[in-house]
Regions:
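Extended C-terminal subregions enriched in glycine
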Residues: 89, 126, 147, 180-181
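Alpha-helical support elements that line or immediately flank enzyme active sites
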Residues: 170-183
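Structural recognition of the beta-strand scaffold that forms the well-ordered cores
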Residues: 84-85, 93-95, 115-117, 156-159, ...
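Extracytoplasmic/secreted cell-surface and envelope-processing proteins
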Residues: 104-105, 125-126, 176-178
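Short, solvent-exposed loop/turn segments at the edges of secondary structure
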Residues: 78, 109-111, 138, 150-154, ...
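Internal maturation/activation junctions in enzymes
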Residues: 2-99, 106-112, 119, 126-136
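Cysteine/selenocysteine-centered motifs that mediate thiol-based redox chemistry or coordinate metal-sulfur cofactors
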Residues: 120-166
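A short acidic/small-residue loop/turn micro-motif
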Residues: 100-102, 172-173
Length: 183
């Protein structure tokens, strides 16, 4: 921008296109921070900004119908942890554990000091209604005695000739599948 000069046609065009995208994000991601968690870190992330400007054309305006809010980058989960360990004898473990939401169920086990999760949210409580992460699931995932909820956790160990060759897993809730798929 500095080489284009202040208020040059190129600079004004770039600023206008950036402002249009910011305004589209404003309508969806901004609000009173006392009532709404504003995703400041995600909105100001360099990768997010680069993605927002990926359809920028320096020679013409982006059609207004194409200027929508951006898709926020998945934030690193504060509630889900994955670890993979191999010892000297080749014993391997791949573990993913989660609270699901901040502070899980908000219930601490007396005398133990750890929180219980709220994985019940991963069941379908009402068909057609989203859970806390916006996922809508069908009746096949309805709550039932002894039933396990649908989960995206995929701690994985690949074996080669009977020995652990690759172990992987990741936090990320509903984005776990796409992260694992890329490996």
């Amino acid at each position: 921008v500095s080489e284009w000069g202040h208020n040059s046609a190129k600079t004004v065009h770039l600023m206008t296109e950036a402002e249009r995208r910011v305004y589209a994000d404003r309508a969806v991601y901004l609000g009173d921070p006392d009532f709404f968690k504003v995703p400041i870190a995600q909105l100001t992330n360099d990768l997010y900004v680069k993605e927002r400007m990926s359809n920028f054309n320096p020679s013409k305006a982006t059609p207004s119908m194409e200027v929508r809010e951006g898709i926020l980058l998945a934030a690193e989960s504060e509630q889900t942890t994955h670890l993979s360990i191999v010892d000297q004898q080749g014993n391997a473990v791949s573990v993913t554990t989660t609270l699901n939401d901040s502070y899980g169920s908000r219930v601490v086990v007396a005398g133990s000091g750890f929180l219980l999760n709220n994985e019940m949210d991963d069941f379908t409580s009402k068909v057609g209604s989203p859970n806390m992460f916006g996922l809508v699931q069908g009746p096949q995932n309805a709550i039932a005695p002894g039933k396990r909820m649908l989960s995206s956790m995929t701690p994985t160990i690949f074996l080669e000739n009977g020995s652990a060759a690759l172990m992987l897993g990741t936090p990320g809730g509903s984005t776990i599948f796409t992260s694992i798929y890329q490996v």
